[in-house]
């Protein structure tokens, strides 16, 4: 008889094969993430290339960005390069990238022992150097720029894939769409995409058939330039990996966290995507590429990394942990040690991680403050005072602060709930708040496999743990208990809000699983068994905060009910058009480039430049970064209606219509799009957009969409 996982896998493959995807996000976003990836939870990122030769960056920076620093006047990298390599160019360093100690079978053995279920190797980073024999690389660069023709003179990607495929680990690859200084990219972007990027990607897919295709370097152009939708349609419909490949969301500026496959936060442990598959990546130190500047104390401890894995798994995500081999092909011993330590822990506790899903409650907090300001502690370079945010959140809190004392994961196939705790309680009692277990429920301790005694104390469950014995309890980075045949809960309802044509009041629909009952409130209070019963769509007459939850019709037990879904619902009022005398095309702008840090406070009455712009754009900036804009004028609306506005920016921005804030996309962040609505009468309306860039990459896009119409950038602007 076939096992259930095999049957699920076969069913999943049939479902994927039956679907034909169109080259648009609406269709592509419907492709489910392959089941194997959802079950895997832990992967290894590998950044390896010519940048391993210098293998250097100042602390708090990425060593794989070495070339970019050399060519953008990074004085620290330039000083290091001059001292070590003299007048040699970065391209000449490919001759020193020998990889003479690279043993792919040893790497594969290490990966399997680490407990990782997949790897993602950089087939090509932003410098354009490829780890496989790419004829496009040599052609567009005009010299040998791939590992088969220079340096190692071997197919590093192919050799590693062959070795990994002898193990239980899935083989995946990273691919940078963008190349910083590729001469073809700099002169003809469309030709670069059609004659370089696409042929390389198809070469990789057809010849290496990766289980993961992880793109990056997307920010410099929209998905339309990269022809990302067309490529994904081919990948999903026709490619040899159409049924198994996993992709991420880095397919063009503004796409990340909005479209594509899995969402891919990077050093963003606070981000959470409850309704979308995701994976957070990070290094063991800070750099992804090998950085000889980092010291032992710059690396996260094994406990910190195990807790990071637990944290991601408890919230339904995957953890992609990076290693950076050196130019000789050796993985630094400290990185090997960390991987083996994680593997040791997973050997004991892996069933609490693999094949699990997010439970209705992801963690349980102790008493205390939760307003941690958890920036990236590595950037300070002071491990003694910076601390480790994962450890502070769990085992080493600052005075007065709470910790996540319990994490929960759930295996739906087995109906088992796992409770993971990073700190062994002194009194050997584990308390699960707000849970009621059926009499006779079996609970076991994964470290020793022994059954545990428990009792129901009011609304809480108390579990008696064994005496802590280090001879029996190995790999004490965290501990787990299994609660058998318990944990199935009603799925959280989905709240859908629609505005019918010509209607400013929203229609509310709430969806949930068959066999469940939905109760909801419209005043922001938490719903309960006696709240309003949802039976059919309802029109909402005022601004409301809707909260809804579901529970099984034959069991309203709170611990098995769904988590609460919420939605802010607005009933809009018409905003009347303004009388504007002699409007002229274009919009006013004020430009700022202060000497100090840039934020919303930089926008004041003393601009560095003023003028008229054809559209709301940052193309008029006078320097690469650290600037701000203030746009003000009028927007012409052609007919009465409810309009959606979209504000996409890196960093912060705000949009106002008729002096009313419609969108607040403020703060320091990468490219993020937010939206808001306004009911506008035909005619002119004031529009005001403010924007700042605090440094690094920057972008701003303002779009409008009539109800039922097409989203497009705002063009009808006046002053």
Named regions from a protein language model:
Residues 116, 120-123, 510-512, 635-637, ...:
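Aromatic-lined ligand-binding clefts that engage carbohydrates, nucleic acids, or primary amines
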Residues 476-478, 541-545, 640-642, 682-684:
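Extracellular Ig-like/FN3 beta-sandwich strand-entry sites
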Residues 487-585, 596, 609-629, 656-658, ...:
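Short, compositionally stereotyped local motifs that mark structural "simplifiers"
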Residues 20-26, 33, 37-54, 551, ...:
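Accessory carbohydrate-binding/adhesion or oligomerization-edge regions at the termini
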């Amino acid at each position: 008889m076939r096992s259930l996982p095999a049957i699920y896998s076969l069913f999943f493959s049939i479902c994927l094969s039956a679907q034909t995807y169109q080259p648009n996000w609406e269709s592509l976003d419907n492709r489910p993430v392959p089941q194997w990836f959802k079950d895997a939870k832990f992967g290894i990122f590998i950044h390896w290339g010519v940048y391993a030769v210098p293998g250097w960056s100042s602390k708090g920076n990425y060593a794989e960005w070495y070339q970019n620093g050399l060519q953008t006047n990074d004085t620290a990298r330039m000083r290091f390069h001059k001292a070590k390599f003299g007048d040699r160019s970065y391209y000449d360093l490919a001759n020193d990238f020998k990889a003479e100690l690279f043993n792919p079978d040893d790497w594969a053995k290490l990966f399997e022992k680490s407990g990782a279920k997949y790897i993602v190797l950089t087939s090509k980073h932003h410098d354009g150097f490829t780890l496989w024999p790419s004829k496009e690389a040599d052609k567009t660069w005009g010299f040998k720029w791939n590992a088969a023709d220079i340096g190692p003179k071997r197919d590093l990607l192919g050799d590693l894939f062959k070795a990994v495929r002898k193990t239980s680990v899935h083989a995946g690859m990273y691919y940078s769409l963008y190349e910083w200084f590729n001469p073809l990219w700099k002169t003809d972007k469309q030709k670069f995409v059609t004659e370089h990027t696409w042929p390389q990607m198809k070469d990789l897919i057809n010849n290496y058939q990766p289980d993961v295709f992880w793109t990056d370097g997307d920010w410099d152009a929209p998905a339309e330039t990269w022809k990302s939708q067309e490529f994904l349609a081919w990948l999903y419909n026709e490619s040899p990996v159409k049924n198994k490949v996993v992709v991420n969301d880095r397919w063009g500026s503004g796409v990340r966290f909005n479209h594509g496959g899995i969402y891919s936060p990077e050093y963003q442990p606070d981000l959470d995507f409850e309704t979308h598959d995701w994976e957070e990546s990070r290094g063991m130190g800070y750099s992804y590429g090998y950085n000889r500047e980092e010291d032992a104390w710059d690396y996260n401890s094994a406990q910190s990394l195990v807790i990071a894995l637990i944290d991601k798994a408890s919230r339904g995500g995957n953890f992609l942990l990076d290693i950076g081999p050196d130019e000789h092909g050796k993985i630094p011993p400290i990185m090997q040690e960390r991987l083996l330590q994680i593997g040791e822990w997973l050997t004991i506790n892996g069933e609490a991680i693999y094949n699990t899903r997010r439970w209705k409650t992801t963690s349980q907090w102790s008493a205390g403050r939760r307003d941690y300001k958890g920036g990236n502690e590595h950037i300070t370079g002071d491990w003694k005072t910076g601390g480790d945010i994962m450890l502070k959140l769990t085992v080493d809190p600052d005075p007065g602060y709470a910790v996540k004392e319990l994490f929960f994961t759930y295996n739906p196939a087995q109906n088992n709930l796992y409770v993971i705790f990073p700190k062994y309680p002194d009194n050997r009692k584990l308390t699960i708040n707000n849970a009621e277990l059926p009499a006779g429920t079996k609970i076991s301790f994964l470290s020793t496999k022994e059954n545990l005694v428990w009792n129901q104390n009011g609304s809480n469950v108390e579990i008696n743990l064994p005496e802590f014995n280090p001879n029996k309890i190995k790999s004490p980075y965290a501990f787990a208990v299994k609660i058998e045949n318990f944990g199935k809960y009603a799925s959280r309802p989905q709240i859908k809000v629609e505005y019918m044509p010509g209607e400013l009041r929203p229609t509310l629909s709430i969806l949930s699983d068959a066999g469940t009952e939905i109760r909801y409130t419209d005043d922001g209070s938490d719903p309960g068994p006696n709240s309003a019963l949802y039976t059919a769509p309802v029109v909402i007459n005022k601004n409301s905060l809707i909260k809804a939850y579901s529970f099984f019709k034959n069991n309203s037990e709170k611990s098995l009910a769904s988590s609460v879904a919420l939605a802010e619902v607005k009933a809009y009022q018409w905003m009347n058009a303004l009388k504007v005398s002699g409007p002229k095309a274009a919009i006013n702008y004020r430009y700022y480039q202060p000497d100090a840090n840039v934020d919303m406070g930089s926008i004041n009455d003393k601009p560095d430049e003023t003028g008229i712009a054809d559209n709301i754009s940052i193309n008029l900036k006078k320097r690469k970064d650290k600037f701000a804009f203030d746009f003000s004028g009028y927007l012409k609306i052609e007919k009465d209606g409810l309009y959606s506005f979209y504000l996409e920016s890196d960093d912060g921005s705000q949009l106002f219509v008729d002096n009313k804030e419609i969108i607040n996309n403020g703060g320091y962040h990468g490219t993020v799009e937010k939206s808001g609505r306004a009911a506008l009468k035909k005619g002119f309306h004031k529009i005001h957009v403010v924007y700042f860039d605090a440094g690094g990459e920057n972008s701003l896009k303002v779009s409008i969409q009539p109800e039922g119409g097409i989203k497009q950038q705002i063009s009808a602007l006046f002053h």
